[in-house]
A protein has these predicted regions:
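Aromatic-lined carbohydrate-recognition surfaces of secreted/lumenal glycan-active proteins
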Residues: 2-32, 85-98, 122
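Structured segments of extracytoplasmic/periplasmic soluble domains
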Residues: 4-12, 76-83, 110-123
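Alpha-helical scaffolding within the catalytic cores
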Residues: 26-41, 64-80, 102-110
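Aromatic- and acid-rich polysaccharide-binding/catalytic face
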Residues: 33-67, 123-125
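Glycine-enriched alpha-helix->loop->beta-strand junction motifs that scaffold or abut catalytic
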Residues: 41-45, 85, 116
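Intrinsically disordered, low-complexity coil segments
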Residues: 56-65, 82-83, 130-132, 140
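Substrate-binding cleft of secreted/luminal carbohydrate-active enzymes
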Residues: 86-160
């Protein structure tokens, strides 16, 4: 399906302005990550999807669990992206409801800083589901942490 979609978009529709990311769920592990890989000629970027969780309202334990998983995933993804000459990204992440007041600066940033990630993408903010959001907005109680994250020298947004 991945190959058919890419071929349809590029050959049939003539689209040339799309980057194609292969990104199985983060729990695929190094032994299964490439099991459905469509081939180097169909992929531009290798990514992982891994979400944080707040376990029993224990920010420190939740942070440690997230770091362990993400470091393992980004380590094997670094090897794979080098072997296949691909960019790598953190294609989906976030903490639903942002219950950690410092999720951006003390959970996400420390775990990505040592890896050559081309981009990080959080999941959506649902307009119709209270509590189902992954990015702060102006007026949100922890918006200052996302703002501090955005001002780090290592972080660049699309409009910069």
């Amino acid at each position: 399906l991945y190959r058919l979609t890419r071929l349809y978009c590029t050959k049939e529709r003539g689209l040339t302005n799309i980057l194609w990311c292969y990104s199985p769920n983060g729990d695929a592990g190094p032994e299964n990550y490439m099991s459905r890989y469509p081939g180097d000629e169909f992929v531009d970027i290798l990514g992982i999807d891994t979400y944080a969780g707040l376990r029993d309202n224990n920010v420190e334990a939740s942070r440690a669990f997230f770091w362990e998983a993400v470091k393992s995933q980004l380590t094997y993804l670094t090897v794979l992206s080098n072997d296949h000459h691909k960019l790598m990204c953190f294609s989906e992440t976030g903490l639903e409801g942002l219950g950690d007041p410092h999720w951006w600066t003390e959970t996400l940033e420390p775990v990505i800083r040592d890896y050559s990630i081309s981009y990080v993408l959080t999941w959506r903010n649902a307009h119709d589901q209270p509590g189902h959001f992954y990015a702060a907005w102006e007026g949100f109680e922890h918006a200052d942490d996302m703002k501090a994250f955005s001002e780090l020298d290592s972080i660049v947004f699309l409009d910069e």
